[in-house]
């Protein structure tokens, strides 16, 4: 095996592009070797995160999820899709390769969200305050419940989910599409599994895609 993005891997990648062009074939590629996005360049700072309650106390940490079905050189933690800076750092790893890529490479593909248990990001509280006008930290007990017990709690749950949905759209779906286009390619996105209004996320991509 050639480790992902290694010089040997890149040599085979450019050979593949050359042969595909000779044969009249098109190529799309993912930004990784498995799903969701992530890999060896993702540190704990950029990795998917979660909140949980331990003995009634709100705590945060990593989900610990790794890239599924990763090929050699692509193993590692899953990206925090709610963090724009994390995505920017991750995508920068592909700039040198894609700047040298050429036709018939057509599209860059996000092979589904599926970041299980990722329900927190460091910008959650300030983003929640900006979007909803009140401090979620004063209502953390609501997040410890499986379901709301009042209209007020229903509203807090709704505001929390809307905030996470907004962060995913603004900090990943739209930046992914814009970045791919800026590199000269078409964006493809599988949005299923996302904790959002799926139509909004699919609309952000050039090619919205589902599994079949």
PLM regions: where:
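Surface-exposed charge patches
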Residues: 18, 178, 200
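Regulatory input/activation interfaces that engage signals or partners
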Residues: 173
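Beta-sheet entry/capping signal
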Residues: 24-28, 103-107, 177-179, 184-188, ...
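Mature extracytoplasmic enzyme cores
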Residues: 3-160, 165-170
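Hydrophobic targeting/anchoring helices
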Residues: 36-41, 109, 183-212
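Acidic/glycine-enriched edge-of-secondary-structure segments
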Residues: 72-80, 181, 207-212
């Amino acid at each position: 095996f050639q480790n992902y993005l290694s010089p040997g891997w890149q040599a085979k990648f450019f050979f593949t592009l050359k042969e595909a062009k000779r044969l009249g074939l098109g190529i799309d590629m993912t930004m990784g070797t498995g799903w969701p996005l992530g890999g060896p360049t993702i540190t704990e700072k950029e990795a998917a995160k979660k909140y949980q309650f331990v003995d009634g106390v709100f705590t945060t940490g990593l989900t610990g999820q790794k890239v599924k079905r990763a090929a050699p050189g692509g193993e590692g933690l899953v990206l925090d899709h709610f963090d724009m800076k994390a995505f920017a750092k991750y995508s920068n790893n592909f700039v040198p390769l894609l700047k040298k890529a050429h036709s018939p490479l057509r599209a860059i593909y996000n092979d589904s969200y599926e970041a299980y248990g990722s329900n927190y990001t460091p910008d959650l509280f300030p983003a929640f305050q900006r979007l909803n006008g009140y401090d979620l930290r004063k209502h953390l007990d609501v997040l410890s419940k499986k379901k709301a017990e009042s209209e007020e709690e229903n509203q807090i749950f709704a505001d929390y989910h809307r905030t996470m949905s907004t962060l995913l759209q603004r900090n990943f779906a739209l930046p992914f599409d814009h970045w791919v286009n800026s590199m000269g390619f078409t964006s493809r996105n599988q949005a299923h599994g996302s904790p959002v209004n799926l139509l909004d996320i699919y609309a952000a991509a050039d090619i919205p895609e589902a599994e079949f």
